[in-house]
């Protein structure tokens, strides 16, 4: 049966079928919670004689357990003729420990009419546990014709057993469709089909939650979970899982999870197993003894609707490769199509133990092997074959005008034993690569009867891999060699014709590709040299034709830059020698090292923040002798732009300072600080540094008149401001401030494809500031502020970065670098003193132009080759606007509390500063 691509019509049609088929002449029998039955040693029999067309309708949850009908030789629900329907009405039906005797098929349900149908629909929970639990009995649900599980929520079959077929379900036509919650088959056992056996079609479709078959067993037979003599269709489900199912009977057990073979001697068409459009499909750790650790079938079609995985399945066939994951029976065929997800074969093996994904028995073949754009079919386990054919296989063929340009991958990278058999795949067919990519990696070998390519397709070979034609010619029109494999192999890729007098032709240019970009970071590329990358080996008496150009195009990349040139040597076998002419080096962004000079910006921010703390202390309510203890934090962020990569500097620490007002005109203070910083470039580098800082402040207070008298050398000159609002002879405050900081850096660079690198070096930072301000009383009792203090400063900051080098083989050397900045902050501060004179707050606005600046930069070079490049720091604008605010509280005569915050804004950069502290007078 084939289903609509839309789930609704399918579920709706089955619902209508259920209603109309049972409503014409049916008797509705209500099952209430009072009908629940729990047998004991005195009363263990419970059997319903079902009449044709009966409908059992639940009005509440019903539980039936501990039933033994052995003496009656009947199922719990025995149907001799006609159909039966169980309608859940969103209630639960539970069966536990049901027995019907060893000669009766179906302990819970036996429907014996070859034209009838048994249906279960609309249940909130449908549970069958150990019904029966004895392998000598004959399964849980049996229908001689059709059996359907439709539109239920939770469905559970656990530990049901049968000595014949289908431990959970046995029927001629089994349908599990449209269920809304999980459907699970766990630890069921039978001879054929540990969970389900169908002598005709088996459909599992449009289920909206997990379909799980786990630890089911085929004892003395095949199909650990499913066995069918008819078609198996598993389509459009949300998630299908087959895990740890097994068929391990010696000389019999095939298909650890699924087995589908035609009835011996039958003239009916060969049944097909179809997996289509399932959002996720997983076969994991299923086991068989005679082939097909997961699936054994004559005809198999898998079309992915999402990730499709065959993982760690095993076929225990001694001394034979009979399909660790899949075995295709004699004369059979297999189609694999990655439509909406990648299909992966990994860790599947035989008992020898050799990796083995798919095995083709005699005359079996691939019908389709194709992947849509963006998806792939990945064989980390080889394909083996007993066939010796020459039928045509068009990889990524396009029979229905669909675009198949994805990747078919054969790789030996998952082999742990490094046995040659883990790497060799055989497809005994004439293969044409119609479109997309055929990729052979990590030592894998692929043998076909004949190989050709259509224009626009790509054959990609690693070094050390082989493409072999066992019977016919090889004609290649689009060849690429993956030079990322230079790091793992020095053996040339081989293209070989095994049969005498056969030809190998290579036309169009040969590409050298590096998908990861790491090939040009290989240290061997630092020198010009020749690499033998390709060997063409025709059969005895055969010939090689090469029309590829001598110069190979090089796509833009990072790492060592240069050109490739190709030359061929040899007469019979030809070896392609690729000459690499190295020119220079271009570092990838994460290797440029921009964080190193950027740290100088962080040093400057930290030193300036200490200077600002001392300036703030000088405006204290109590300027006499005291000790300040402050906590300080800086948050400097440069956002990404056309000129910058992102940079962040966060630091925090403490400040200890002492101050003293020597005279009313002379004030001085000294400070010590320790800061802990984290810097990052948002790429691969992070730095931590510890910075020790010291600073000294001297402040001198005079008046405007004194300045003019001194300048004019006339003590009788009187100068002031002509305004009622201001003092006629305002004060002038001048200060000198210097600071020094020493930082020890520890940087980690965590590359995506290379080991982590650690570096250490030291930075130093000096700063000098001279400035003046003029306090003016603007409002005696202003609501917002009372005083205005215009100020102007001249500030010099110089930061120096020491040189250092990395100790790794491909390490970098960084030269010293520096930052120099001369700025002139201009602004005004407004102050407000509370009536109690215990609280003072101020806020200020300033503009800071950098009148001279030398941005930080340094030179980086590869130690091993000497190739160098300039490493610039982030470009920070020369113009900044700063807003700040400070609050002070005179707690008592000996203690003052302070909190200050500021924000400095530049285009693409922000700096936030906060400090809180307390002064103790002594």
Curated annotation (Swiss-Prot):
Q: Name one Pfam family in it.
A: ChlamPMP_M
GO cellular component terms, alphabetically, are: cell outer membrane; extracellular region
In this chain the Autotransporter domain maps to: 620-922
Q: Give the originating organism.
A: Chlamydia pneumoniae (Chlamydophila pneumoniae)
- Gene that produces this protein: pmp1
UniProt-recorded name of the protein? Probable outer membrane protein pmp1
How does the protein's chain sit in the membrane according to the entry? Peripheral membrane protein
- Any idea which UniProt keywords this protein has? Cell outer membrane, Cell wall, Membrane, Secreted, Signal, Transmembrane, Transmembrane beta strand
Segments passing through the bilayer: none
Top-level division of the source organism's lineage: Bacteria
Q: What is its main location?
A: secreted
Q: Which InterPro entries does the protein's record reference? A: Autotransporte_beta, Autotransporte_beta_dom_sf, Polymorphic_membr_middle, POMP_repeat
Cellular compartment(s): Secreted, Cell wall; Cell outer membrane
Q: Where is the signal peptide?
A: 1-26
Family affiliation: Belongs to the PMP outer membrane protein family.
Does the record's keyword annotation contain Ribonucleoprotein? no
